[in-house]
Curated annotation (Swiss-Prot):
InterPro entries: Herpes_UL7
Pfam families documented for this protein: Herpes_UL7 (PF01677)
Keywords from the UniProt entry: Host cytoplasm, Host Golgi apparatus, Virion, Virion tegument
Gene: 42
UniProt source species: Alcelaphine herpesvirus 1 (strain C500) (AlHV-1)
Function: Plays a critical role in cytoplasmic virus egress. Participates in the final step of tegumentation and envelope acquisition within the host cytoplasm.
Protein known as: Cytoplasmic envelopment protein 1
CC terms in the record's Gene Ontology section: host cell Golgi apparatus; viral tegument
S-S bonds: none
Length: 257
């Protein structure tokens, strides 16, 4: 199958499936830390590919590296600050992914860096895109195709959110639509804005969550991220609970697709 011909996770110019909330996970005895990947931006605001590649290799070969925690979602399920899915669904989908090569590891790092990029620029986002395309062409596979679709969709979302213009945007799929709506609602008056947000950017499905699993009490778990428009979900205790459970109790998966 020619993976370059027709991405399995896209339809027309819209990505249907993508990985979200990607964090690096490290473990040492009963201590577990989930944190975002560094952005590897140099003093000139450009991506330092050499350091990014070195970081991915170091992570992959570290004895404390457990993998990446992430949640595969349908694009329409992302509601900016939550996911439109029931707790048992997000609990099942959230996985601890252990890439089997440096290409997949670096692509996960790129997604994590994009989600946590506090001050992006159009040129920086395109540099991430170029690097992700290079990585996919080096190692085309179902997983790298899935990750590349995520990179493209997040970059498209950030381009629109920050009002960036760039010629290469035409090759990107459409960004996450809930963020387009969320941005447009910023100009509405408060009463109308709250009503519209409640209708289109909120979910009431994550409401059947009970207390945490008692097995988790034996571990120390810390989660670190940068507050951006793409990481509002980390304020949800229910989403944090599913991430924590995946990091501490689930066996790692070696493939996503």
């Amino acid at each position: 199958m020619d993976l370059r011909a027709k991405p399995a996770s896209t339809c027309s110019n819209y990505t249907l499936l993508l990985p979200r909330l990607v964090l690096e996970v490290s473990k040492n005895d009963k201590i577990c830390v989930a944190c975002n990947s560094p952005d590897f931006v140099n003093s000139n605001g450009n991506l330092n590919v050499k350091d990014l590649e070195a970081h991915a290799k170091a992570r992959l070969h570290s004895s404390h590296f457990a993998g990446f925690v992430l949640c595969p979602i349908v694009a329409s399920e992302d509601k900016v600050s939550t996911f439109d899915m029931y707790y048992h669904v997000i609990q099942e989908r959230t996985v601890l992914y252990r890439p089997q090569n440096t290409v997949l590891t670096e692509m996960c790092c790129i997604i994590s860096a994009l989600e946590n990029c506090v001050v992006p620029s159009a040129s920086l986002l395109i540099q991430y895109l170029d690097r992700a395309n290079q990585l996919f062409n080096r190692h085309p596979s179902r997983d790298s195709l899935f990750l590349l679709g995520g990179v493209k969709t997040l970059i498209s979302t950030l381009m629109h959110w920050h009002g960036f213009q760039h010629p290469d945007v035409s090759q990107l799929p459409r960004g996450l639509q809930s963020y387009e709506l969320y941005k447009d609602l910023e100009s509405f008056d408060a009463e109308c804005k709250d009503l519209m947000l409640s209708m289109f950017c909120k979910s009431f499905k994550l409401g059947d969550w009970n207390e945490e699993n008692e097995q988790l009490e034996a571990f120390t778990f810390n989660l670190f991220y940068s507050p951006t428009i793409l990481t509002k979900h980390f304020k949800s205790k229910i989403i944090i609970s599913s991430i924590k459970e995946a990091c501490l109790l689930k066996d790692c998966v070696l493939s996503l697709i």
